Regions:
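Short glycine-aspartate micro-motif
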Residues: 77, 107, 165-171, 188-190, ...
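Acidic/histidine-rich catalytic neighborhood of metal-dependent amide-processing enzymes
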Residues: 115-188, 401-402
Length: 402
């Protein structure tokens, strides 16, 4: 049990920062940070961390902003990606997507839900935790990173290039203030068909690459019942998501066509086996092949960290110490709390899926609003989440000590 006097002091301390926390969120939402351009947003976060007395503030090689606080042996990292998707068609927004609006206690703005909404609570929570002695035994990091275009790349690069490997991670993707403990993985493929171009008036002289892919697309659309299933993570999924065509003109037979396939995988589904599944659909032929995509785009700093687009599934049981600690912190502060999972993918694919680091998710917001013109977060939850981020380290330490 947590001493009631400590809880009262924590709540009073967070309430005293309410206006600062909300203003901080509105300011970082007002700074565009799509297409990995996070520098300006990161600089604003760095200013806030400096004001709060973080011990170290630095940029990693990829261009992610990092703040360190505390000097204990255990390494705890709070992960919040601060890049966002674009706004799409501006005419679909009924308000400025960056300035946003507050209505009935909810902030509507690009990135409010996904996922700048977790940054203020993390940044303030760690500072308050140290001030109150709730961070004793830890070196804690806030990691404001790029995730939208290749989830898991930023943490992978951070660990490899900076040499900092957390013992525990909290992911700030929206969880509705619940404790999330996993999600499905995915693999991204492309299928390339080669044909022969000809003038559309003499199409019989050509070999249409688009037509070659049509039966493959049809077969892919029917294979989902054959895919794996898991009691917690759910059913595997497969979707043809995009198509590109190479053709001399719109009056010519295309000589190349490419489709992209998003394959959501659960436990027991291996990337190589899924590649073979697609190759079996294609059959033995020289003019069509499937391959796993490679991500090798440079970040805004010019940093390149090539990775195959393989994202492992991950999940922890409810009796895992970090899950128990997350639940205990939430129940202490808010009452009964559930565990859950994300439907989409997060940086957990590296932290837990590849590196095996105990990880959970906790944040305000509901993922159904991510990437939409209704991107939103309840401001009360943003403020109250600060209490959780401050209390969690000490609850985790007590849980680990039994």
């Amino acid at each position: 049990m947590v001493n009631q006097a400590i809880l009262d002091r924590l709540r009073t301390r967070v309430e005293g920062e309410r206006d600062s926390i909300i203003s901080f969120l509105r300011e970082i939402c007002a700074i565009p940070s799509y297409e990995n351009q996070i520098r300006a947003c990161g600089e604003r976060i760095a200013t806030e961390m400096a004001k709060l007395g973080y011990d170290e503030i630095f940029w990693d090689k990829m261009g992610n902003i990092v703040g360190k606080i505390g000097d204990g042996d255990k390494i705890l990292l709070y992960d919040s990606h601060i890049d966002t998707v674009g706004v799409g068609d501006p005419d679909e927004w009924q308000w400025d997507p960056f300035e946003g609006k507050v209505e009935d206690g909810v902030l509507y703005a690009r990135g409010a839900c996904d996922e700048k909404g977790s940054t203020p609570g993390m940044v303030y929570g760690l500072a308050i935790a140290r001030e109150m002695g709730l961070l004793d035994g830890y070196s804690a990091y806030y990691f404001g990173n790029m995730e939208e275009w290749n989830d898991g790349q930023a943490p992978h690069a951070f660990v490899q290039t900076e040499g900092i490997r957390p013992d525990y991670v909290v992911i700030g993707e929206p969880t509705k203030m619940q404790i999330y403990r996993g999600h499905k993985g995915r693999v991204e493929f492309k299928i390339v068909a080669k044909g022969r171009s000809a003038h559309a008036a003499s199409n019989y002289l050509g070999d249409n690459a688009i037509y070659k892919l049509l039966p493959i697309i049809e077969r892919i659309s029917h294979i989902e019942p054959q895919l794996g299933d898991h009691d917690f993570l759910g059913q595997g999924r497969i979707t043809v998501t995009d198509m590109e065509v190479k053709t001399p003109s719109i009056n010519a037979v295309p000589d190349e066509a490419v489709i992209y396939v998003d394959r959501r995988i659960t436990f027991g589904e291996e990337p190589q086996a899924e590649l073979e599944r697609l190759q079996n659909i294609i059959g033995q032929r020289d003019d069509i092949h499937a391959e796993i995509l490679l991500y090798d785009e440079p970040s805004y700093t010019g940093f390149v960290f090539p990775l195959d687009k393989i994202y492992p599934a991950w999940a922890f049981e409810e009796d895992e110490p970090i899950v128990l600690a997350g639940l205990r912190a939430a129940e202490t502060l808010f009452g009964q709390t559930d565990t859950g999972k994300w439907d989409f993918s997060t940086n957990g694919i590296y932290w837990a899926g590849k590196a095996g680091i105990p990880s959970i998710g906790f944040a305000p917001g509901n993922e159904i609003h991510a990437h939409t013109v209704l991107d939103q977060v309840p401001l009360e939850d943003v403020v109250r989440s600060t209490e959780w981020y401050a209390l969690f380290p000490s609850i985790l330490l007590n849980t680990l000590q039994g």
